[in-house]
């Protein structure tokens, strides 16, 4: 379905369930999609960080998009990551995901190669010129090692190059500058500013953000939808209480032993363990070479679920 302008609400970055031999587990993926739709989300973002897009082969990426788009059948917009190191590779992904039915594409700045802001701007202009669907920028400096500047984002928004921004930078001052700048700019309309944080959704919405793309919404979509609704209703006391409950639940991402695994292994392993414990996916496997959680660490995830009333 066409992406609303602006896109608002809760748009989970959908986890990619895998089989024990690391193929895409399509039945589990579709159960997860049903879980999210039943939770009342406003859109789905596949092939992002929580989707383990960086680990998926091109064949797997296309299968994910085709499966999700076919299953939702236009009920919700499906945004698909077209994330790769350089512009030519991203343009290939744009073609593949849009042929598979994606309603919008999401792209980071180029990475691995050393780039200049002028080249980042050219990157997005080329993507928009070749994409038949709207383009969202994904600000993820922890992974791509460059920050999308406020002036650049607003310039590209005013040109119509970008339909929105998913901000996972952790820079709340910069996020506020984009929110207020987009609102004040006479040449910008329908531009969506989305926080990628699980922990400050209430404050992001209070400052004027359009919605959120929280990975934890895979586990508890109802909670984030409830939080969004409370914020929109101006019930800030109950919204704060719901945000605090979700912050406590988010503690699961730290169950993994930092001495033997990276942060992504711990966080994504926790999300998948939670989905497995809740009976939504068949296997909690993460993509190689991520280190799996131990039985004791998975038990710890279960305690977080129980504490949040989800198990």
Question: What are the language-model segments listed below?
Answer:
Residues 11-15, 39, 209, 220-311:
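C-terminal alpha-helical cap/extension of soluble enzyme domains
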Residues 129-130, 141-255:
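Catalytic alpha/beta core domains of metabolic enzymes, predominantly
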Residues 2-147, 290-291, 311:
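Active-site beta->alpha loop and helix N-cap motifs at the rims of alpha/beta catalytic domains
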Residues 56-59, 117-120, 148-150, 177-178, ...:
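Short secondary-structure transition/capping segments
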Residues 39, 63, 67-72, 96, ...:
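Alpha-helical structural signal in soluble globular domains
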Residues 26-33, 150, 295-305:
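Short, amphipathic alpha-helical "lid/cap" segments that border enzyme active or binding sites
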Residues 12, 46, 51-54, 84, ...:
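Short, flexible micro-motifs
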Residues 29, 61, 65, 90, ...:
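A general structural signal for well-ordered alpha-helical segments in protein cores
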């Amino acid at each position: 379905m066409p992406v609303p302008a602006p896109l608002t609400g809760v748009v989970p970055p959908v986890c990619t369930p895998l089989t024990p031999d690391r193929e895409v587990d399509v039945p589990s993926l579709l159960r997860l999609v049903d879980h999210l739709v039943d939770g009342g989300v406003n859109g789905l973002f596949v092939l992002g960080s929580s989707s383990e897009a960086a680990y998926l082969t091109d064949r797997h990426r296309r299968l994910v998009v085709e499966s999700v788009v076919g299953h939702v059948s236009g009920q919700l917009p499906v945004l698909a990551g077209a994330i790769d190191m350089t512009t030519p590779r991203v343009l290939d992904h744009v073609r593949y995901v849009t042929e598979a039915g994606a309603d919008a594409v999401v792209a980071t700045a180029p990475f691995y190669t050393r780039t200049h802001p002028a080249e980042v701007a050219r990157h997005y202009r080329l993507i928009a010129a070749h994409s038949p669907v709207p383009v969202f920028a994904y600000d993820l400096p922890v992974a791509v090692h460059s920050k999308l500047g406020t002036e650049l984002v607003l310039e590209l928004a005013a040109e119509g190059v970008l339909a929105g921004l998913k901000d996972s930078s952790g820079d709340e001052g910069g996020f506020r500058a984009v929110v207020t700048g987009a609102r004040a700019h006479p040449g910008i309309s329908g531009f969506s500013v989305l926080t990628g944080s699980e922990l400050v959704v209430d404050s992001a919405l209070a400052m004027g953000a359009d919605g959120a793309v929280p990975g934890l919404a895979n586990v508890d979509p109802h909670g984030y939808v409830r939080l969004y609704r409370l914020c929109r209703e101006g019930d800030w006391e109950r919204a704060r209480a719901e945000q605090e409950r979700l912050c406590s639940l988010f503690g699961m991402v730290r169950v993994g032993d930092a001495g033997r695994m990276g942060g992504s292994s711990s966080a994504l392993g926790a999300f998948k363990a939670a989905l497995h414990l809740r009976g939504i996916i068949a296997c909690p496997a993460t993509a190689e070479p991520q280190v799996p959680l131990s039985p004791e660490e998975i038990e710890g995830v279960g305690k977080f679920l129980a504490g949040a009333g989800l198990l």
